[in-house]
């Protein structure tokens, strides 16, 4: 009767019951409550609830009341529902741990790659750098060589052109020989006379240059110079005489019935004058001063530069002579309209200059000096 009047909480529990071996269910719940994902307060509550529930399950007594069993069942159900709820902190920790592992693995890969690069650098880099440097040096040398060659060719060409112009215009025999032939002519005729004379001069220089290269030691320069100077003097005398003859001739009246015949006669006369001009240019070119064209071309470092100098020297001679004769012909044509008989006077003057220069050249040979 006394046991029925005492409350259930006052019942004493034998110590032997606490020393009994725990069941597997108790171990499982204790392990689940020890996880780090639960907060500290909730962890303590779950431990208490699970211990109480396990205690009542392992130690059922006939003295326990139905209310106590119901309360324990309610506590067990609430603990199960709390454990089944998802925890967002747990997911975040999983993600953060995965990212940390990923970062560590990427760092390891970078570290291994750096070590491999350091180990392979002395083996692979020097041969590659040497091949690259060789290719760069060879390409740079080719580019620099091409630029130097182009510069050398252009410089030689312009030098030859100006040398030909100066050589032609600075020779008194050239000017004296072409003046009588170009006075009283139109611009086109004067240009043709100058170009023919320039081509003949170039041909004579080429002939002399080839003879010099072929014969060399056998070629006596002094003998050729002496006789060449005399021939030039004689040609000047002939040109002067022809100019005086042309100036002294009176113009004949033109007849209509004989117009075709006169035209044919004039064209034949022009052909003869053209051939004479070309031949005069050859004679003036067959002089030792042709070495002024040959020797610089031979002294240049490359054959291309020498060829460019030679070609431009010849072109400069033709252009200079054509320009000179066009200038003289244009001046005579312009003065013809204002001053009557100016053509005859200019022809007389230029012919006398040519004759005087020819005589001076020939006579100077006998006195031991040369004007040419």
UniProtKB/Swiss-Prot annotation:
Record keyword Plastid present: yes
Expression tissues: Mostly expressed in leaves, stems and flowers, to a lower extent, in roots, floral bud, inflorescence and siliques, and, barely, in seedlings.
InterPro entries from the UniProt entry: Chloro_ReproSupport/MetalTrans (IPR052776), UreH-like_TM_dom (IPR039447)
Transit peptide: 1-78
Region spans: Disordered: 1-20
Topology term for the membrane: Multi-pass membrane protein
Function: Together with CGF1, essential protein which supports female gametogenesis and embryogenesis, probably by securing local energy supply.
Mutant lacking the gene: phenotype: Various vegetative defects, including reduced leaf size, dwarfism, and abnormal cell death. Plants lacking both CGF1 and CGF2 are impaired for female gametogenesis and embryogenesis, and have abnormal leaf morphology with yellow patches associated with an altered chloroplast integrity; this phenotype is rescued by sucrose treatment.
Swiss-Prot/TrEMBL keywords: Chloroplast, Membrane, Plastid, Transit peptide, Transmembrane, Transmembrane helix
Pfam families for the chain: DsbD_2 (PF13386)
Localisation: Plastid, Chloroplast membrane; Plastid membrane
GO biological process: chloroplast organization; leaf development; plant ovule development
One CC-aspect GO term: chloroplast
TM region(s), chain numbering: 109-129, 161-181, 195-215, 231-251, 281-301, 309-329, 352-372
Annotated Polar residues bias: 7-20
Protein name (record): Chloroplast protein FOR GROWTH AND FERTILITY 2
């Amino acid at each position: 009767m006394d046991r029925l009047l005492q409350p259930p909480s006052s019942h004493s529990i034998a110590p032997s019951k606490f020393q009994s071996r725990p069941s597997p269910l108790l171990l499982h719940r204790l392990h689940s409550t020890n996880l780090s994902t639960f907060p500290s307060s909730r962890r303590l509550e779950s431990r208490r609830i699970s211990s109480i529930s396990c205690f009542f399950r392992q130690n059922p007594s006939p003295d326990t009341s139905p209310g106590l069993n119901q309360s324990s069942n309610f506590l067990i159900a609430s603990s199960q529902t709390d454990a089944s709820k998802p925890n967002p902190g747990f997911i975040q920790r999983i993600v953060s741990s995965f990212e940390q592992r990923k970062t560590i693995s990427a760092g390891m890969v970078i570290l291994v790659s750096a070590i491999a690069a350091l180990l392979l650098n002395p083996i692979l880099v020097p041969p590659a750098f040497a091949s690259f440097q060789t290719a760069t040096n060879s390409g740079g040398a080719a580019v620099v060589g091409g630029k130097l060659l182009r510069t050398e060719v252009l410089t030689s060409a312009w030098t030859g052109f100006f040398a030909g112009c100066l050589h032609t215009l600075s020779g008194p025999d050239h000017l004296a020989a072409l003046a009588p032939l170009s006075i009283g002519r139109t611009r086109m005729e004067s240009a043709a006379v100058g170009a023919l004379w320039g081509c003949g001069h170039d041909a004579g220089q080429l002939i002399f240059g080839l003879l010099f290269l072929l014969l060399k030691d056998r070629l006596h320069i002094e003998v050729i110079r002496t006789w060449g100077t005399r021939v030039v003097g004689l040609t000047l005398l002939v040109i002067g005489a022809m100019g005086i003859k042309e100036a002294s001739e009176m113009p004949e009246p033109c007849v209509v019935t004989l117009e075709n015949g006169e035209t044919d006669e004039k064209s034949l006369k022009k052909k003869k004058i053209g051939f004479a001009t070309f031949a005069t240019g050859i004679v003036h070119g067959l002089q030792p001063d042709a070495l002024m064209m040959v020797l610089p071309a031979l002294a240049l470092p490359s054959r291309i530069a020498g060829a460019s100098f030679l070609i431009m020297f010849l072109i400069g001679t033709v252009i200079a002579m054509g320009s000179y004769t066009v200038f003289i012909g244009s001046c005579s044509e312009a003065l013809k309209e204002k001053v009557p008989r100016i053509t005859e006077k200019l022809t007389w003057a230029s012919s006398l200059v040519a004759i005087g220069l020819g005589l001076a050249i020939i006579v100077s040979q006998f006195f031991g000096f040369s004007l040419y």
